[in-house]
């Protein structure tokens, strides 16, 4: 939860995406504005009656005109509704980016925790084997241990160190991804805590598939697909209103150029929609509605398929985990000490010794993989549903 809060506050991609909502709100504000009036002024350059240039007196000719466009058929309100729909899409897009980043954060979190534990297994084996090697070198110098046996142990130790190095390189990459998500400086490691006891409480039967299918409606991408249809319908209404005639009123003053001096008049102008009735844009808007409708249907079907696969994946991961025995992890140190003691006493051969080391290591790593798979399956299901179904 702390990591998710840092993601909300610090992630640069999320902050950048949030600006799209502000931009969409600005477009709503813009759509509410009325058209500006147009003012025209005209002054005669040369008065032939008195020979004056730019005569601004009573005998000089000057005109002034003001014109205001008035939108008909509710064009302004329809444009506002369209921009509100676009803002809603921007909000859902932000939620979708957040859903994706949160999933990436949680999966990286789980990967780091289990990668760290895997390195701990290598550390224990390397530490134990290093102590054994020190004792063997002393015996080798006394001639009690053959060079072949010592070489086999050195080879095993080198192999473990190489595998550990690969795990550490992977951990560095995962830490880098986590720091990028949380906008932390490179190399800054934060402590991560993951409670395994939660795995014993996971019960898929408590949340039936049908219930989760009903939860899909809150998914941001599905809400965005629906908002696209709504915005397309709003656009069709706007385009139809744009087919209405353009109407404007104007007032005019003419000082000395009309049939009387100081002439005042008002007028109107109306476009005649004979040729252009916005047919092309109306048809395009209708097609856009059908297109977005099909895309919404596809998004819903895709979400249901993803949910079905994720639900089954979690069930299988939980079933496989519960069929395993995690006691080996807790008894790991005691088991290794027992193997070392038996090997020193020659109760087991070199091949058996190496096999025990490899088997214990592989079993512990596989157990971590089983646990990790359950956590990742829970996170995948949470992401697909669009809300937290399983807490951890």
Q: Model regions: which residues?
A:
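Short flexible linkers and secondary-structure junctions
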Residues: 1-111, 147
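Acidic, low-complexity, intrinsically disordered peripheral segments
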Residues: 1-4, 186, 366-392
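Bacterial Sec-pathway N-terminal export signals of envelope proteins
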Residues: 1-38, 43, 69-70, 144-146, ...
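Amphipathic alpha-helical coiled-coil segments
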Residues: 16-31, 97, 101-122, 131-133, ...
């Amino acid at each position: 939860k702390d990591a998710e809060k840092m993601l909300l506050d610090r992630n640069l991609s999320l902050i950048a995406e949030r600006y799209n909502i502000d931009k969409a709100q600005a477009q709503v504000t813009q759509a509410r504005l009325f058209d500006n009036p147009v003012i025209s002024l005209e002054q005669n350059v040369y008065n032939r009656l008195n020979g004056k240039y730019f005569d601004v007196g009573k005998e000089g000719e000057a005109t002034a005109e003001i014109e205001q466009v008035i939108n008909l058929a509710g064009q302004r309100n329809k444009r506002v509704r369209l921009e509100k729909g676009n803002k809603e899409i921007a909000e859902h897009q932000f939620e979708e980016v957040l859903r994706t980043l949160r999933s990436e954060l949680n999966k990286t979190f789980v990967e780091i925790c289990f990668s760290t534990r895997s390195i701990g297994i290598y550390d224990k084996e390397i530490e134990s084997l290093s102590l054994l090697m020190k004792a063997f070198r002393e015996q080798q110098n006394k001639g009690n241990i053959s060079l072949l046996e010592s070489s086999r142990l050195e080879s095993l130790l080198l192999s473990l160190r190489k595998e550990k190095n690969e795990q550490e390189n992977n951990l560095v990459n995962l830490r880098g991804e986590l720091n990028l998500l949380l906008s932390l400086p490179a190399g800054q490691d934060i402590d991560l805590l993951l409670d395994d006891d939660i795995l014993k409480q996971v019960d898929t039967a408590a949340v039936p598939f049908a219930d989760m299918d009903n939860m899909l409606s809150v998914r941001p991408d599905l809400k965005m697909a629906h908002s696209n249809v709504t915005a397309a319908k709003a656009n069709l209404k706007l385009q139809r209103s744009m087919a209405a005639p353009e109407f404007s009123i104007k007032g005019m003053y003419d000082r000395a150029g009309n049939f009387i001096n100081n002439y005042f008049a008002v007028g109107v102008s109306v476009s005649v929609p004979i040729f252009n009735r916005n047919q092309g844009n109306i048809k395009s808007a209708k097609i856009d509605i059908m297109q977005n409708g099909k895309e919404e249907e596809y998004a819903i079907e895709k979400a249901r398929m993803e949910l079905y696969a994720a639900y089954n994946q979690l069930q299988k991961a939980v079933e496989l985990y519960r069929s395993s025995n995690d006691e080996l992890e807790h008894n790991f140190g005691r088991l290794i000490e027992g193997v070392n003691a038996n090997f020193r006493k020659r109760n087991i051969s070199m091949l058996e010794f190496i096999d025990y080391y490899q088997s214990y290591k592989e079993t512990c790593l596989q157990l971590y993989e089983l646990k990790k798979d359950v956590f990742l399956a829970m996170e995948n299901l949470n992401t697909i549903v669009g809300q937290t179904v399983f807490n951890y």
